[in-house]
């Protein structure tokens, strides 16, 4: 456990390796920004928790490996995750919830389910990057509004699921698509 707070930015270097582990939540407070330029690993029983009022931001330009079923979520305020690097859920067989993701890099799901939610289900997120879902894994767009623009791609033999989000899909084919709830406007590029 532990936390970062205040109104500044905590930046990790390109050659750094940052392991967020242990049994306690990893808290973000106030309006803090965490910028990862190196390698960040999230493992352990609990995830990242954006707590109290204010807008919290995680910018990932490096690699972020989620090796747990724990969530990256919020309570009060907002949480935005901007991924222009590589974000992977590589371990765990259950669901990891990721709130507030905008992807212009690469998101890979190789184990379990990565569920994309938004703050209170009302946020709007644009994706111009790649999503790759491995065999037996699931990428679940669960809430809020997600726009997959023409530059984005969804690949892999795993399942892509729309389970409650409002989707605007402007990309090529989506392999293994399951729609269980929500709204989807599909305008294949």
Predicted regions and their residues:
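Extracellular beta-strand-rich, repetitive "passenger/adhesive" scaffolds
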Residues: 1-189
């Amino acid at each position: 456990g532990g936390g970062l707070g205040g109104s500044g930015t905590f930046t990790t270097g390109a050659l750094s390796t940052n392991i967020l582990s242990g049994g306690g939540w990893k808290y973000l407070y106030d309006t803090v920004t965490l910028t990862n330029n190196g390698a960040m690993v999230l493992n352990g029983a609990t995830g990242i928790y954006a707590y109290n009022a204010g807008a919290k931001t995680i910018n990932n330009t490096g690699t972020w490996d989620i090796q747990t079923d724990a969530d990256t979520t919020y309570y009060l305020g907002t949480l935005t995750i901007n991924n222009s690097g590589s974000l992977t859920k590589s371990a765990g067989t259950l669901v990891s919830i990721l709130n507030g993701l905008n992807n212009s890099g690469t998101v890979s799901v190789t184990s379990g389910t990565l569920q994309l939610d938004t703050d209170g289900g009302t946020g709007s997120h644009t994706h111009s990057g790649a999503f790759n879902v491995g065999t037996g894994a699931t990428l679940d767009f669960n809430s809020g509004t997600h726009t997959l623009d023409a530059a984005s791609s969804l690949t892999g033999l795993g399942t892509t699921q729309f389970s409650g989000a409002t989707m605007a899909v402007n990309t090529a084919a989506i392999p293994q698509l399951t729609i269980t709830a929500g709204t989807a406007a599909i305008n294949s590029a």
